[in-house]
């Protein structure tokens, strides 16, 4: 079984029914009796106070797992590349001075609000303790599967593009931070709020 990791300065978060929605992607142990089988990607089909019924994406097998058995799905670029019905590559945002450079960025439209958002992604390797400490001071709690995160923390920040002035032919827009996320299920929640289509499981993750 993969391990949850704790970044210094943050306290473990206990997850429960209020943290998840139907359709959310999670990692869960294939077998509770044989940890050597590892975790597989699954989605939540039903919920109650103690746990949820999940369906493994690769096998369609249905099992019940308590919330303590679940692990967050780290953000990787496959989720953006393989969901073009939601995301479009972008390159028009630059990091603030002193911040890490973006690993990649995308844009998407909130159909419900007629608003366009940018999502920029940082990738930080676990040994980069100084950067972690700074992010923790800014309020970041980061937990995920150690194996599935490929040795790095991925932090995505969503920004709304707000027009602040107009010059002939175009608006000058300023990005305004909306939220910071570290897991796919949090991204799913925001996209649902925006009226976007549901994310499909990247084929590369199913084949891995």
Label the predicted regions:
Residues 182-208:
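Acidic, proline/glycine-rich low-complexity IDRs
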Residues 59-87, 184:
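Intrinsically disordered, low-complexity, charged/polar segments
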Residues 2-20:
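Mixed-charge, Lys/Arg-rich low-complexity intrinsically disordered regions
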Residues 57-61, 94-178:
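Acidic, low-complexity, intrinsically disordered interaction modules
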Residues 52-53:
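Short aromatic-glycine-enriched beta-strand elements
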Residues 34-48:
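Short beta-strand-centered aromatic/proline hotspots
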